[in-house]
Amino acid sequence: MKHLVADDVARASALAASHIADLSRDAIDARGMFSVALAGAPELEPVYRALRARKDVDWKRWEVFFAEERAVSTEDPDSAFGFVSQHLLAKVPIREAKVRPMFSLGTDVAAAAVDYIDPMVSLLGDPPVFDLVLFTVGRNAEVLGLHPLCPALSSVSPVEAVADAPIPPEGDRVTLTPLVLRAARALMLVAFGPRHARALRMVLEDGDDRLRVPGQAIRDAQGEVFLVVDDALAKALDLR
């Protein structure tokens, strides 16, 4: 695991954006595209802001999927698609056909999960291998749409529906699974502020308990893992 630490949120976000730009360039050089799964969370807004300001990203080569989604309209404030579109996708020249929403209002979440698998596997293989999965962590070490004791944690499918997820905002979700985290070429976990110290200690330091600590799925990663934190959180975790 590589720790990306900077003095404050803005600098840490800029550092994350720089590494994403590097990963994008390397993937495009190697495979002609950059495949990424993005999460919609306020914690990621400064990262998206820093990323969209960069001039060295070949946006037209990006293939965008989502790491998780709530069963809401894309106009709903809780929509991951809406959040990422507002803070990144609508502000950069990514082709609409290259952006794949995870859920459409009126669709059953179980059907949405099944429907999301085919385009992902067709483009990225089985299991799908993303160049990057970008996400954050919840207060109980939740990642993506995966909460403690969630059945999807042991799924052999890359995408699952989660009914009545207790992760705020509560409700049905569609999510990638640990299978995808394990196979990805790179994972980037972003967290700012000492309030995340407890959750990250559970992820990084506690004994293995993947079903009760979903974030521990990153321990099985076959690719690179980047932990992006600000100085306040780094000190709380004794990383500085």
Feature-to-residue mapping (PLM):
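A glycine- and small-aliphatic-rich helix-loop capping segment at beta-alpha/alpha-beta transitions
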Residues: 49-59, 82, 86, 148-157, ...
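Glycine-rich N-terminal segment of FAD-binding domains in flavoprotein oxidoreductases
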Residues: 28-53
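Glycine-rich beta-strand-to-loop/alpha-helix junction loops that act as flexible
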Residues: 38-43, 135-139, 192
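Ligand-binding beta-strand-loop-alpha-helix segment within the catalytic cores
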Residues: 59-134
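ATP/nucleoside-binding phosphotransfer catalytic cores, i.e., glycine-rich phosphate-binding loops
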Residues: 185-240
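Class I SAM-dependent methyltransferase SAM-binding "motif I" and its flanking Rossmann-like core
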Residues: 132-179
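A short secondary-structure junction signal
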Residues: 111-113, 143-149, 199-203, 239
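N-terminal glycine-/serine-/threonine-rich phosphate-binding loop
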Residues: 1-36
